């Protein structure tokens, strides 16, 4: 590994962490944690799935996801129903109030980020657009 690659990895990691922190603070009155919001967003985007599938998608251990789902269910943000094929399983889906929470959180983050992006010229916004695609590619391809 070249020193420049190590520096890029360090700089990129720091930038992503700082951006995540800024986005996290855009909706401080949210009743859910970031891990709960992430699980809700996945369910809203991808539809109902088993807790095990959601744990894999969120890259957490199944017991951790079980706790996340239980707390979201207690707050009324997810619904659980029997699996149509495997009676031992349940399917978890986002409830109406959970979907509204995801939309509100997404809107708050997007409003802040659009405001910040508009301070950049179009060339810099294009660079960020390409970088976002590359970051997602890196994440999706990682084990």
Swiss-Prot record:
The residues covered by the HTH marR-type domain are 5-137
Annotated region of DNA binding:
51-74
Determine if DNA-binding is one of this entry's keywords: yes
Keyword set for this entry? DNA-binding, Transcription, Transcription regulation
Q: Which SMART domains match?
A: HTH_MARR (SM00347)
Q: Which InterPro entries match?
A: HTH-type_Bedaq_tolerance, HTH_MarR-typ, Tscrpt_reg_MarR-type_CS, WH-like_DNA-bd_sf, WH_DNA-bd_sf
Pfam families according to UniProt: MarR (PF01047)
Name the Gene3D superfamilies on file. Answer: Winged helix-like DNA-binding domain superfamily/Winged helix DNA-binding domain
For this protein, what is any one GO molecular function term? Answer: DNA binding
UniProt KW Transcription keyword: yes
Q: How does it assemble?
A: Homodimer.
* Name assigned to this protein: Uncharacterized HTH-type transcriptional regulator ML2140
Name its species: Mycobacterium leprae (strain TN)
């Amino acid at each position: 590994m070249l020193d420049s690659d190590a520096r890029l990895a360090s700089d990129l990691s720091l930038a992503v962490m700082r951006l995540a922190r800024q986005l996290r603070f855009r909706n401080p009155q949210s009743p859910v944690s970031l891990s709960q919001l992430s699980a809700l967003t996945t369910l809203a985007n991808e539809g109902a799935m088993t807790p095990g599938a959601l744990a894999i998608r969120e890259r957490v251990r199944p017991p951790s996801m079980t706790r996340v789902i239980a707390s979201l269910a207690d707050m009324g943000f997810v619904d659980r129903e029997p699996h149509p094929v495997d009676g031992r399983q349940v399917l978890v889906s986002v409830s109406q109030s959970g979907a509204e929470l995801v939309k509100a959180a997404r809107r708050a983050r997007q409003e802040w980020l659009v405001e910040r992006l508009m301070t950049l010229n179009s060339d810099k916004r294009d660079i960020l657009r390409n970088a976002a695609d590359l970051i997602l590619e890196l994440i999706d391809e990682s084990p």
